[in-house]
Amino acid sequence: MKFSRLLLTSLFAWFSPVFSQPLCAQSDEGKLRILVFGAHPDDAQYKGGGVAAKWAKLGHHVKLVSVTNGDIGHWQSAGGPLAQRRLAEVKKADAIVGAETQVLDIHDGELMPSLENRLKIIRVIREWKADIVIAHRPWDYHPDHRYVGVLMQDAAFMVTVPFICSDIPPLKKNPLFLYSSDGFQKPYPFQADIAVSIDDVFEQKLTAIHEMPSQHYEGGASGSEEYVAKVPPASDEAGRKEWLRNLWVRRQTHEANKFRSVLNKWYGPEKGAAVKYAEAFEICEYGRQPKQEEIKVLFPFFP
């Protein structure tokens, strides 16, 4: 199965000039341009906030995009007021990360992989002139997550085709499309190709997530009075931050331990073994298939 996948990918890359061009930044200034898609106004920050901060620190251009407006993502409120609240939250969070913010005006829970939405995603990718695009896999517990993955797949390659969305110039090079990590097993589990240490930006990521209280401290759509009662109150900011830190230490430590062999591949056994917190990504078959030296250009954090 794995051999067949690699064979098909190799053949595709061999025959398609879009997939086999030398890799460099789309923009003339030489800085990378990265898009991280999430289904809701918090997903991109959770899944790629660490690596986004690392790129931003090096002067690269990062945008975190929510494909829906999050207007049903709370157990006590909904509609326009919630959408506006969540937009304000992610703007604060993204400013801390060093990224730009975009939230598409699609209702939470109603995202479909339609032609209309495919064209929206193509436009977002082209307008940003993206070198790297990250999104959910199309196998996830939430339909909005799944369809973000499908829409990314459907936009891959099409972003280079001149006569679709012809009012926006096509990209000269197909971006590297990546899936963010998850724990789902069917039809096949997440397979990490790249794992990045976020030890140096972990506190920065936590500070950003702290600015989205509707989702963590209040529980989002899955919250309740019982949930909120277990979280330190807003008056105890230090207690809240400690509660949040303990939660994310567990999550990002699990990610690092789960993908330790991939960290060792990119950092070497000694440095890889020392990584505490990580974010991992899988290369989508429908976009660029970079060689190892190309990945090091796109992820300029590896030794």
Locate each region found by the language model:
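Bacterial N-terminal signal peptides
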Residues: 7-18
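Active-site rim/loop-helix segments in enzyme catalytic domains that contact anionic ligands
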Residues: 21-128, 134, 150, 158
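Conserved acidic residues
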Residues: 131, 175
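C-terminal accessory domains and tails appended to enzymatic cores
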Residues: 163-166, 171-173, 184-188, 194-303
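Short glycine-rich anion-binding loops that position phosphate/pyrophosphate groups of nucleotides
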Residues: 138-140
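Functional cores that coordinate and move charged inorganic groups
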Residues: 145, 150, 154, 177-179, ...
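Positively charged n-region of N-terminal signal peptides that target proteins for export
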Residues: 1-5
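Cysteine protease catalytic core and zymogen-processing segment of caspase-like enzymes
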Residues: 152-166
